[in-house]
Amino acid sequence: MKDKYAFVLKSIRKDMSLLPKKSYLNGKTYIVSGASRGIGFNIAKKLVEKGANVTIIGKTQNPHPKLEGTIYSALEELQNLSNEKSTVLAFPCDIRNPVEIDITINETLKVNGKIDGVVLNASALCLNDTLQQTKKEVDLMSSVNINGTYLFGQKCLQHMYKNKEGHMLMIAPPIDMLYTDDWWTNHKYNS
């Protein structure tokens, strides 16, 4: 059994990172949606730390009473982490809005010349009992999680396709979330 995983053990550095010592992200350009906070912000942070140019997008422009962070507070924190060779950009962008997506992509291309990857993290989730779920909530989740994610990914993919390279990472709820009785019982629509 030990020999089976020897290649993995050899690739793990002392800092427990599987990434190569010389970052393959240096100079690469990534766009991260839903990056005002949480998973999106932390992915953007790691990309910046590894030397990538990062454009973050999100809808939260003003402080929210229940949610931490704005696109501008995230930008400030990421700029403090970046080196002089990498750029960090931020745009308020609703991934359901083709005009805002085009502005984000065009400005990113204007500054960095290419898009090497996109992280599709923006989402909407309304956790209500299926019988309590409103049409408005279902429409919001469908328009963001399906239509918006598809539209934003498609537009970024067009530019990556021209470069004949690129990476796309789509964030989804954890699998174990779906295997609890409580999840299935109370949130059938969201599953």
Name each region found by the language model:
Residues 1-29:
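Non-catalytic terminal and boundary segments that flank Rossmann-like NAD(P)-dependent oxidoreductase
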Residues 29, 36-37:
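Conserved glycine-rich cofactor-binding loop
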Residues 68, 102, 125-139, 180-187:
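Conserved mid-core segment of classical short-chain dehydrogenase/reductases
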Residues 91-103, 135:
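The beta1-alpha1 cofactor-binding region of Rossmann-like NAD(H)/NADP(H)-dependent oxidoreductases
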Residues 169-191:
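Catalytic loop of short-chain dehydrogenase/reductase
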